[in-house]
């Protein structure tokens, strides 16, 4: 009799735990969410549940529309053992003339949960991948490093890219920002479902690198973001970078229509209807027509300021105006850069041309006034050619003086790219948030060059010193294929410190943030910029006199 009662109590306990959303005790690979049951994969030291749809496929009549939550009910167990596919894209890092990758039906999330841990539940890191809003994918930022530490659940997100994600005519008919709206729906899915995987919905940290970092910032500028996440980190990208908020998108939208055979469209509604009828491959392949040379500009299609009457508009004001209004989510935020972030995309200037055998940077001596507005993203922000030429001349004089563009002067060209595309906006965004926000604002700079990074990949060269370029920090958190697996001892330490930093920030009960032995200093209420410097030798808090 006592045995029967004990068994009944045990069964009731299992039922209660299952109802509470915990991972099934009898089979941790079998997870139940509102759509039904799904089965993941055992990877030794972690479990993975990949390519779970969070939105209806954005195809057919749902192309160029606000994403719709995935409602299908599974009659059989969903197979979550296959890696996510890439959203269709024209990828910069593919050699050759055909850079097309991916498919249109791609709106999925993937969940990675540590195994063999003393914890039953984990804080959550949701990652928005980078790629200039044009390319990349959730699998681009590998999960092995984070899973090795066994301290957080990682969720990666696929979202629409390039023209499929960001074409816009600036009005309600074709408003744009579909990729950002995808991200937001995915974050809502995480909030509602992560407990079923052993995640803590009250401890969600949203992070992103480059365009992912800018996406994090843009998500944070919505007042309802605080309902989806506890804190946020933008690595080497924020909403104030000049390549983020696009101008001239209406003209590009109609030019896209002309390229794919919608040239007869005279209004946004007609253009949208025509574009919906065209093969996605044709639309994405048209990206090549918007590149001046190589992959420049690297973001021909990106976030837009939408019309207030657009359906479910994402942002209707410039980020600066949103911050000044104070109407954004008050969650702790960290923003970062690397000392030579401009190695992307300055490094491609060192690539030797097959026709002449000389580097592209040499051609800048004759093409600077033509190319600079595209390289540094002021082509659409200035009204006259004279304004552009005057600014181009000023930049060249400030960074090069009377020297010519050459391999020998590359370092100063890269410094220009770092300042204008990444570093300067960190200072401005921190300054604005400390003035008009209430929640903590943190910043750090990373200075520790990797052996192989974006500089070497884009230039195809190992004979040039690039410094600490774009991604050298984040690629110690999320492993990528082109970074050597045999990292230096200092990089192993930094990798662990970074991952612990994410865990600390997600779990923090007082909104503080720490890296190793260094506690970040809050910029809110400070007269000087508080910046944590991270190097191979450790970390140090610094004060910079750079606020206005």
Curated annotation (Swiss-Prot):
The family this protein is said to belong to: Belongs to the type-B carboxylesterase/lipase family.
Effect of residue 269 to L: In strain: GB336E
InterPro entries: AB_hydrolase_fold (IPR029058), CarbesteraseB (IPR002018), Carboxylesterase_B_AS (IPR019826), Carboxylesterase_B_CS (IPR019819)
Subcellular location: Secreted
Superkingdom of this protein's organism: Eukaryota
Cellular component terms (Gene Ontology): extracellular region
Cleavable signal peptide: 1-21
Group of enzyme by EC: hydrolase
UniProt KW Cytoplasm keyword: no
Main subcellular location: secreted
Catalytic residues as annotated in Swiss-Prot or TrEMBL: 210 (acyl-ester intermediate)
PROSITE patterns named among the record's database cross-references: CARBOXYLESTERASE_B_1 (PS00122), CARBOXYLESTERASE_B_2 (PS00941)
Annotated glycosylation sites: 95, 116, 479
Protein name as annotated: Esterase-5A
Record carries keyword tRNA processing: no
Disulphide bridges: 87-106, 262-274, 518-539
Record field: catalytic activity: a carboxylic ester + H2O = an alcohol + a carboxylate + H(+)
Effect of residue 228 to V: In strain: GB4E, GB8E, GB115E, GB139E, GB336E, JR50E and JR198E
Effect of residue 266 to N: In strain: JR341E
GO molecular function: carboxylesterase activity
Cited CDD domains: Esterase_lipase (cd00312)
């Amino acid at each position: 009799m006592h045995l029967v009662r004990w068994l009944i109590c045990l069964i009731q306990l299992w039922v209660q735990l299952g109802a509470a959303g915990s991972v099934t005790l009898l089979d941790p690979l079998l997870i139940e969410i509102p759509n039904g049951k799904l089965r993941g994969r055992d990877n030794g030291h972690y479990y993975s549940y990949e390519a779970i749809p969070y939105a209806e496929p954005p195809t057919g009549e749902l192309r160029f529309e606000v994403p719709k939550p995935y409602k299908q009910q599974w009659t059989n167990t969903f197979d979550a053992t296959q890696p996510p596919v890439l959203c269709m894209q024209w990828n910069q890092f593919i050699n050759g003339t055909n850079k097309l990758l991916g498919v249109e039906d791609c709106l999925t999330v993937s969940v990675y949960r540590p195994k063999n841990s003393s914890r039953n539940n984990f804080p959550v890191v949701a990652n928005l991948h980078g790629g200039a809003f044009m390319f990349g994918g959730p699998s681009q930022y590998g999960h092995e490093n984070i899973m090795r530490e066994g301290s957080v659940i990682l969720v990666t997100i696929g979202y629409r890219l390039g023209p499929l994600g960001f074409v816009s005519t600036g009005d309600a008919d074709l408003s744009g920002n579909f990729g950002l709206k995808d991200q937001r729906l995915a974050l809502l899915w995480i909030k509602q479902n992560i407990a079923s995987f052993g995640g803590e919905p009250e401890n969600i940290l949203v992070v992103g690198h480059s365009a992912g970092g800018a996406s994090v910032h843009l998500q944070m500028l919505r007042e309802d973001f605080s309902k989806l996440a506890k804190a946020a980190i933008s690595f080497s990208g924020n909403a104030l970078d000049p390549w983020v908020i696009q101008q001239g998108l209406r003209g590009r939208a109609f030019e896209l229509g002309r390229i794919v055979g919608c040239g007869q469209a005279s209004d946004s509604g007609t253009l949208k209807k025509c574009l919906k009828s065209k093969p996605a491959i044709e639309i994405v392949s048209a990206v090549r027509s918007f590149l001046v040379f190589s992959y420049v500009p690297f973001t021909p299609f990106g976030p837009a300021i939408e019309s207030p009457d657009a359906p479910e508009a994402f942002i209707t004001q410039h980020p600066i105006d949103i911050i000044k209004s104070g109407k954004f989510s008050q969650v702790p935020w960290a923003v970062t850069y690397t000392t030579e972030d401009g190695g992307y995309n300055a490094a491609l200037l060192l690539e030797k041309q097959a026709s002449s055998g000389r580097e592209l940077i040499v051609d800048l001596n004759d093409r600077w006034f033509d190319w600079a507005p595209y390289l540094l993203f002021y082509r659409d922000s200035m009204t006259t050619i004279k304004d552009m030429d005057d600014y181009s001349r000023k930049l060249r004089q400030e960074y090069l003086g009377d020297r010519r563009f050459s391999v020998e002067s590359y370092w100063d060209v890269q410094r220009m790219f770092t300042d204008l595309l990444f570093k300067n906006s960190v200072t401005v965004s921190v300054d604005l948030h400390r003035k008009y926000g209430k929640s903590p604002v943190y910043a750090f700079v990373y200075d520790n060059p990797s052996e192989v990074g974006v500089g070497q990949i884009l230039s195809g060269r190992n004979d040039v010193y690039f410094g600490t370029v774009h991604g050298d920090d984040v690629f110690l958190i999320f492993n990528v294929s082109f970074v050597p697996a045999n990292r230096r001892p200092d990089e192993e330490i930094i990798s662990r410190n970074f991952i612990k930093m994410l865990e600390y920030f997600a779990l923090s009960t007082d909104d503080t943030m720490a890296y190793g032995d260094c506690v970040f200093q809050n910029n809110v209420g400070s007269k000087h910029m508080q910046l944590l410097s991270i190097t191979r030798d450790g970390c140090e808090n610094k004060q910079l006199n750079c606020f206005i």
